Amino acid sequence: MANAARDPYWLATVRRETLTFPDLADVIEDKCATCHMPLGKTELSADSKTALIFGDGFKNPGHDLHGLALDGVSCTLCHQIMSNNFGAPESFSGGYLIDLDTQMGERVNYGPFPVGKQPANLMQSASGFIPVMSSHVKESALCATCHTLYTPYIDNEGQIAGEFPEQTVYLEWLNSDFANTMSCQNCDLPAAEGQVPTSNMAGKPKGPFMQHYFVGGNAYMIQMLSQHWDDLQVTASSDQFKDTLSRIFDQLSTRTASVLIEEAQVTGSHLSVDVLVESQVGHKFPAGFPSRRAWLHLVVYDGNGSVIFDSGSYDQLGNISGNDNDLDASRYEAHYEVIEDPEQVQIY
């Protein structure tokens, strides 16, 4: 969230798109800035201006909104979002609504707790926002404003021909069993034990207090941000990155998916194995932008410890053995019910 604007993979992807389709560069940058640089984008939207990222845009240190845009997805962005269009198609793809008519200093920040007059005055004085209790901050539809994303696609003539569902995490959750028991916030903002003071001044302990960890599965990107913190203008400390990585690895290993060999049979010289993969998340696995993937890696050894079958191995660059897509970007590896050859690999 905090590094949404600094994500080098995202920046490189957007840049590649603008170089490939220069006539649509402004449209692409404005669209992508909506959710990755929402503070700067919202500020420009108030003046009906287009948000640019490269050149003289937000990435330029000389831009008036450079620092604001680099803050990525901040507290005051999400907590200003109104619920007027929640769950409706117009709320998706960065369609969040923020009150731009009320002057700064009088705008509302929504939260889950009731706020007394004195604490409200203190917060308004310190932050410029008036705290207001509203249960909509606990709804998954809040997250859906950016995590249900449809992006335009181009036809052979270079014209926008429609939209493609780039990610539909909210809709996946909405159609899952989790929709009746858990919200996005239940997993991404785990509740702290006990009650917690919500202010350094006149703050009485309250609960449940949701810890804003937003733990995902992208350990690779967190490692890259940590290693290149200076070049990427990262403000988090080394210890904070280590803590985040620890949470990611814990989630991936214990609360993401389980792999179980249900049955293994040897008939003559033939070994057959039934494998069950169970998702433990409230949406597709893997979820999010399409570059993410998960795959089955099955290795069979003989009595001497030598490998006699290996499906799903990978090299130092992350290329999966047998994956047609790694060999040719225009191809896709087929899905399999049965794998009989090491060059076949089940990829999700």
Segments and roles (model prediction):
Residues 2-9, 13, 50-347:
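Primarily the internal scaffold of c-type cytochrome electron-transfer domains
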Residues 2-57:
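Long, well-ordered hydrophobic secondary-structure segments characteristic of membrane-embedded
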